[in-house]
């Protein structure tokens, strides 16, 4: 097989210079005589034999080229259809197949070729070789003594194969002029493979080599080979890598695009728009003096997989290769096998990439699930660590007992339903609240009897959440249903939402969750039975939780606003207070702040006095009723997974309590009560849950385990002597805010509950709420009471205009202290109380008096109040 040797590029007459842009006609003696010495000295006498073999192979290869041409044309049409669907703008070039349409014309005598070689001569590279055998990886460098370049420009076979196609001039038609051979099949393969790479990543590259002989040139011109690299980007870019003066058969406009990276100018056919039509790119005619069929066949076979390796060539790398010998058929077979192996490796790599992506997606989903339940898991570990008396043996027992939890759920729920029915008939009668004079003078509690609402003493002003006397609140958060519920809770009536508790039970049953249904049934059966108000130090937990829950729902404070410090600080309350919590009847006072969960006080009361289990369970029922009545329809949103998790954790707490009871340690008993009482709120205080969902979930969990959790404090210490499986779990409030009415958390005496039937609600929405005599709760009522008491009027407060309802705070500090004593808030000051008074402006209870300090006006003054002469002191 003939080759283009370095002898064609090297001539002694050139003074040791590479041919570069010189005329090689002087190096070739005759254009009609093909001398082996001038053509290829390495071939020598064997050139004639190789030429005969080449003629036989050429005929066979031409038939193969025709077949491949048809197949590649079909592939090109398919790629073009895909490109037309993907590309919406004509400005995008798409692929090299549509951008490159080179019609080679003889340009031997044109001025553009001179400009081209002038440009190439100024470049920083030299031509080391014209042709390299593409089947071999090893690059053989000849004439190293004349090599002025380093080996950095030499690329391997695989890198050179990354170019899309090549047409190399042969030497069989050296003496023939104006002979044109169409190598459309090769160019079609260029278009087909360029469509894949060009449309995919915009970096498809095609390396085209053209060679020919013209009528005005000598036979040496057929030896010239030019390489063109075509890159497909947003704009057409054609880089002429190197070429020779007599050998370039490209148009001048194409050659001038050498260093223009964003040139959309004329292409080979002179379109002037930088783009080619599909028909033009499908048939690219290359005018050539000759073609080497064997090399063309190898190049065409090489370009089948070059689109998968085109990323090996850098955008600015110049593919210059050394000349080497011809490969044997065995080497070609090895090369074909190597290409198949590369294809298999690439397919495996793609499969691995897809598997990695799937694994990453699964990991992300697992991380999201961990984020959803991560908070509850963390709290579970914290609660376990707080119990310092838990041994490793007990921990192993807990793990075994957790596995048996599923078998015990049905019995827990059945016992819960039966126990709820027992507790329905045991409502709590709360002691009554003293009059204002007794409160201020330190008198004792007396005359516990029911008082009904009347408008004969204090008027008809509605109560307000601002009467807690803490700070400013949102005006839009008050009024409406929450306030009505608050009033009815104070009256000892079931709230209006209690009538829909049966609907909540039906909604819970729709979720196929027995625990939720049991909680809804317990909420329907439980009601408040509060008579009048207690002394501030004697407020029960259920009243505190009911008022806090109602007000917090109207404000919209998050459920984990203050966290749960009761489980840690309240647990050690017995030791800090200096009272043995195991001693019956010895009260263990709270050492926690006002904002701790009510569960802390409830658990300590349970461990400090006997016979309070009924009250605690009644309080639990009331809280469940409050939580269920707020959003009964949201019970459906509680997932079965959350309920199972709650029940499992409650069973876990039960096992901890039983193990601690065996240790017979009073401190461990108190800690277990704290741990059990604070569980439902801690389990669900995740930041992303809504407070209504948490309330329903916690209520369902507490109801499911209410009948099964046995008091751990009722062992030898006799802390709780309630018969049966009395529960000590006190459901904490779903939220804690500044308005939590902390005086309700104080300890005090309790009376045993009397069986009563629940009263039906009598007040509806929109009805003005009236207060009761001697139980002033709201700030405006408190001030109105002071104005009717000669002990304080006009000493601390007085009327300035009785008819208009204008009054003045004579001693604002004293009034604020009295209000703080009334609300059991010793840190109350006028600044805090004044914010509550200003809140009444928005409620329409008080009116602002301009220009006067400490002066306020009642909008609607009751006419039947006690008249006091405030003029004299």
Swiss-Prot record:
UniProt function note: Probably acts as a transcription factor during metamorphosis.
Coiled coil segments of this chain: 45-155, 330-426
Entry superkingdom: Eukaryota
Residue spans of biased composition, Low complexity class: 330-346, 400-426, 466-480, 621-676
GO biological process: cell differentiation
Protein's UniProt keywords contain Nucleus: yes
Lineage of origin: Eukaryota, Metazoa, Ecdysozoa, Arthropoda, Hexapoda
Keyword Disulfide bond in record: no
Keywords: Coiled coil, Developmental protein, DNA-binding, Nucleus, Transcription, Transcription regulation
GO MF annotation terms: DNA-binding transcription factor activity, RNA polymerase II-specific; sequence-specific DNA binding
Chain residue ranges for the region called Disordered: 321-346, 400-427, 439-485, 605-689
InterPro entries assigned to the protein according to its UniProt record, in alphabetical order: Ets_dom (IPR000418), ETS_fam (IPR046328), WH-like_DNA-bd_sf (IPR036388), WH_DNA-bd_sf (IPR036390)
Protein family: Belongs to the ETS family.
PANTHER family (UniProt xref): ECDYSONE-INDUCED PROTEIN 74EF ISOFORM B, ETS
Gene from which this protein is expressed: Eip74EF
Compartment list: Nucleus
Organism: Drosophila virilis (Fruit fly)
DNA-binding region: 777-859
SS bond list: none
Protein name: Ecdysone-induced protein 74EF
GO cellular component: nucleus
